[in-house]
Amino acid sequence: DVNAVTTFDYTAYMLDYREHTPALIDEGLRFFRGIAEGPTFDPQAIVWESRVILAEMRSRDSVTTRQQMDNLPVIFRGLGFTRHTPIGTEQTILSFRREHFLEFHRRNYRPDMTVIVAAGDFDPEQIAGQISASFGALPKREDPPPVRNEGRLNARGLRAGIFRIS
């Protein structure tokens, strides 16, 4: 099973295997290596995935979700990530092209910003060797990682209040 999740500060790709033969783990590591090296970002696949994302946005569109998003700037006052959601807006989803994805990947998918976690009932030395064999030769980037200036949280003192909804 393959899945991914994007939050405000990271994207995680997950493979869930019911079995864990060395060949199957190698196949999964090749999949992750492909993500690290750079997907092709086929324009037709981008259109298809955009439709999937828009459908996901529609399925999540609820009063509760809108309230949560409206509360972010209040709860996290001063932090820049409250201006957008990880999924984006319909406008950005429809306007992104292959070159946007390539640039985002080039800037953010770097060996020095990658963490690989393996959990399961397997020999730790064997899995460490497979991971090292798959990712050890990724070229180190010369340019520094991007600096994310998301602002500074404006701390407030504690306060109490009564809220009435009628």
Kindly give the residue locations of the regions a language model identified:
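Non-catalytic beta-strand/loop surface segments
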Residues: 1-23, 44-45, 59-113, 133, ...
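M16/insulysin-pitrilysin zinc metalloprotease superfamily fold
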Residues: 15-49
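Helix N-cap motif at beta-to-alpha junctions
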Residues: 19-22, 120-125
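Short amphipathic alpha-helices in soluble, non-transmembrane regions
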Residues: 28-33, 128-135
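Residues marking the start of alpha-helices
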Residues: 37, 89-92, 118
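Short amphipathic alpha-helical coiled-coil/interface segments
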Residues: 50-57
